[in-house]
Amino acid sequence: MLKRIISARYIRNMSSGASLVEKAKKSAAYQAVDENFPEGAKVVGVGSGSTVIYVAERISQLKNKESFVCVPTGFQSKQLIIDAGLRLGTIEQYPEVDIAFDGADEVDTELNLIKGGGACLFQEKLVAAAASKFVIVADFRKRSPSKLGIQWRKGVPIEIVPCAYAKVSKDLEAMGAKKVELRQGGSAKAGPVVTDNNNFLIDADFGEIEDPAKLHTDIKQLVGVVETGLFVQMAYKTYFGEESGEVKCWSK
């Protein structure tokens, strides 16, 4: 059973010029840090995304910030850590993480996640797996009313070895994917997106996902797949910034 907690106590003292959604995202991030940051933490994972910017901001305000290191999940989060004046570490140096904070593209009612819209899914999952507690911060648009694949309609992000993209694409179609696309760089880059690990990304649309654990396992068995953006039963809590300006927390 999920516990739902509504709070508006972090809304006060914010710039009136900010949009209500941005205020709520900031409130969610601040509340997530304040309620979950472990006393005596030595290693903290910091993810990426627009809401995690506020997580880094709040962590930088802690009086004991010199006593712990922050491990990034990719280039963007590395820059967040540096810009916030926090001590930077790596997952190679610190394979055990006390707590990790990250965003999500979608969260279902069982706290399963779709991540990878920002192309950092492998390192995000590595840090999440290393963490004793994994806390998600997002806005209300990322919350599914039931299953994954309802709010996030771009498909499951899948990181693959570049030379395997054609074979993996065919295999995903055979598994029932309605649409399979090799993610492109768009106007910023000609050709496919290249991850921080020098891999490609495929987005595979399976519609509403009935069993994310099985789908993750089936995809991982395909030769050439590095990791999927399905984070199954990894999150400890999720904080949502609501359109109303309140914060809603889902926990196990």
From Swiss-Prot:
The keyword Isomerase applies. It holds the Pfam family Rib_5-P_isom_A. GO terms for biological process: D-ribose metabolic process; pentose-phosphate shunt, non-oxidative branch; pyridoxine biosynthetic process. It catalyses: aldehydo-D-ribose 5-phosphate = D-ribulose 5-phosphate. It comes from the Eukaryota. Pathway: Carbohydrate degradation; pentose phosphate pathway; D-ribose 5-phosphate from D-ribulose 5-phosphate (non-oxidative stage): step 1/1. PANTHER family: RIBOSE-5-PHOSPHATE ISOMERASE. Belongs to the ribose 5-phosphate isomerase family. This is Ribose-5-phosphate isomerase. It comes from Debaryomyces hansenii (strain ATCC 36239 / CBS 767 / BCRC 21394 / JCM 1990 / NBRC 0083 / IGC 2968) (Yeast). The gene is RKI1.
